[in-house]
């Protein structure tokens, strides 16, 4: 990925940070984009400390003007964008009857609507690239298998999978590829508060590898799907990195 530029939305977080490091170590220049200035700066410092070219831009993906500003600043800093990774996410643990419309709308605004608008803005730029571009949208195993207490999150992630495949179909002829990774259970900011002892036991019983994933274990799939060489004939692919969760019948 030498000479390529990747914008990582949600890049200051645990999963996004691992993806930023993985792509950077493969030679890409990284733009860390997240909602918090301090978190972005800390992530960039970590990346730079291991020799990765990295910069940052604060973004709120629920506001289109902020997304447009991210693209503008990224182009000013790097001259182009070859890869877009959508890794921002919001979750909340409630029973179905306790999901109110405000919570539902808030989760969908980040997980699906924000992702859709980000793809729109960046695809317009990628269409000007001679080599097109690659998009990686982070989904979830909950888009495929039901899980209690994450109803809005799961529904939004099912939308992410569908959106990704529609983008892939729409822009394949213009050399823009879109794929999705659906992680299994990776402890991160948005789900740690949901992982009580009983829930962890149930999840491990349903995961054949009987352990959580490490953020670094998403990197291989990301490199494959974003690579112009290794993933050149892959678009609309949904890759589950889940320790076997989606193939298990408990």
Task: List PLM regions with ranges.
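Canonical Rossmann dinucleotide-binding motif of NAD(H)/NADP(H)-dependent dehydrogenases/reductases
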Residues: 1-31
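Substrate-binding pocket helix/loop in short-chain dehydrogenase/reductase
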Residues: 95-96, 100-108, 191, 203
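Active-site loop-to-helix junction immediately N-terminal to the catalytic Tyr of the SDR YXXXK motif
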Residues: 99, 146-154, 166
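Active-site helix of classical SDR
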Residues: 119, 156, 164
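Alpha-helical segment proximal to the catalytic Tyr-Lys
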Residues: 124, 169-173, 232
């Amino acid at each position: 990925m030498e000479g390529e530029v990747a914008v990582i939305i949600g890049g200051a977080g645990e999963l996004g940070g691992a993806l930023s490091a993985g792509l950077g170590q493969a030679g890409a220049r990284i733009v860390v984009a997240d909602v918090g200035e301090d978190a972005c700066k800390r992530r960039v410092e970590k990346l730079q400390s291991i020799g990765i070219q990295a910069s940052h831009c604060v973004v709120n993906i629920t506001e289109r003007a902020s997304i447009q500003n991210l693209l503008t600043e990224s182009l000013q800093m790097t001259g182009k964008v070859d890869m877009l990774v959508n890794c921002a996410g919001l979750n909340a643990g409630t029973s179905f009857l306790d999901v109110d419309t405000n919570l539902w709308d808030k989760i969908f605004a980040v997980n699906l609507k924000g992702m859709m608008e980000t793809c729109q803005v960046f695809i317009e730029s990628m269409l000007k690239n001679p080599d097109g571009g690659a998009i990686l949208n982070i989904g979830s195993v909950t888009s495929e298998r039901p899980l209690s207490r994450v109803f809005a999150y799961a529904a939004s992630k099912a939308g992410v999978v569908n959106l990704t495949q529609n983008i892939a179909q729409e822009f394949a002829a213009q050399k823009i590829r879109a794929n999705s990774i659906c992680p299994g259970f990776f402890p991160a900011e948005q789900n740690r508060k949901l992982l009580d002892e009983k829930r962890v036991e149930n999840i491990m019983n349903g995961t054949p590898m009987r352990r959580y994933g490490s953020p670094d274990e998403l990197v291989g799939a990301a490199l494959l799907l974003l690579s112009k060489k290794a993933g050149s004939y892959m678009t609309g692919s949904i890759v589950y990195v889940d320790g076997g969760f989606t193939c298990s019948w408990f």
